């Protein structure tokens, strides 16, 4: 299925929930973008809801939930969600990843790490691995050079051979033990925290992302949007986004928000 231009997505009052990937969707050239942050504030000030859905680690997600204008954060590709109540000054944390963090999981992740780094010596352990609870993040282009997108998919394939779920993002290959993903936990969050029914999800939620680890979301939500830099990944996707922005990265995020608020 070929993606449609963004103007084919008709804004409606029922579109109350914007779920968005972070790296290379909400960021521009690996940094927070002032226009994207302004767009997120405008979305929230319109009375609507925003939830970040990211592969980034628990330590970062605590910060996102506290400091950003979002209702909640789904992190480590669906291992958990965090939701900060500013009035009560309390963080709600729900962990859905299995197995639970601990020494046994740490040993299994280290074994997978050692295998990948031995077989793909140009790859590196992600710099944010120390802040993760559930998954292994292999850096193929954030802080390293010399690896291609094809290499990233080879790494993901090898991790699957080791019995892990593996997804390629725009910067990392993330792998974990268990069946959760961005979609399963997004549905759980929306149903538990906002009371949405399965039927309501289809017309209430807009999702925007940029890479193969967003594919479960692109498949699940009819109102799925890819920022323009998703295009190199489309040949690797069985379930592409339904709509595409003309701009890449954060500029595409701004384009989407402006379109929905028009």
Where are these regions (language model features)?
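Conserved acidic, metal-coordinating active-site core of Asp-based
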Residues: 112-206, 211-220
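Residue-level marker for buried hydrophobic side chains located in beta-strands
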Residues: 18-20, 73, 207
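Short, structured coil segments at secondary-structure junctions
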Residues: 68-69, 77, 162, 220-221, ...
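Non-catalytic pre-domain segments flanking phosphatase-related domains
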Residues: 1-20
């Amino acid at each position: 299925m070929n993606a449609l231009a963004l103007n084919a997505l008709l804004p409606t009052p029922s579109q109350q929930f914007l779920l968005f990937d972070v790296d290379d969707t909400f960021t521009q050239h690996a940094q927070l973008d002032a226009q994207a942050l302004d767009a997120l504030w405008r979305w929230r000030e319109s009375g609507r809801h925003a939830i970040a859905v990211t592969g980034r680690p628990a330590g970062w997600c605590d910060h996102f939930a506290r400091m950003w204008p979002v209702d909640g954060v789904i992190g480590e590709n669906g291992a958990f969600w965090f939701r900060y109540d500013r009035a009560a000054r309390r963080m709600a944390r729900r962990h859905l990843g299995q197995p639970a963090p601990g020494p046994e999981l740490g040993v299994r992740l280290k074994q997978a790490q050692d295998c990948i780094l031995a077989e793909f010596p140009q790859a590196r352990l992600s710099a944010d691995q120390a802040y993760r609870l559930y998954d292994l993040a292999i850096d193929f282009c954030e802080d390293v050079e010399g690896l291609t997108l094809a290499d990233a998919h080879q790494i993901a394939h090898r991790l699957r051979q080791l019995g892990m779920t593996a997804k390629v993002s725009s910067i990392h290959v993330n792998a974990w033990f268990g069946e959760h993903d961005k979609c399963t936990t997004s549905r759980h969050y929306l149903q538990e925290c906002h009371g949405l029914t399965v039927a309501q999800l289809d017309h209430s939620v807009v999702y925007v992302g940029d890479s193969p680890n967003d594919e479960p979301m692109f498949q699940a939500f009819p109102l799925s949007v890819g920022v323009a830099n998703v295009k190199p990944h489309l040949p690797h996707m069985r379930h592409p986004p339904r709509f595409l922005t003309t701009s890449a990265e954060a500029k595409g995020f701004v384009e989407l928000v402006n379109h929905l608020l028009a």
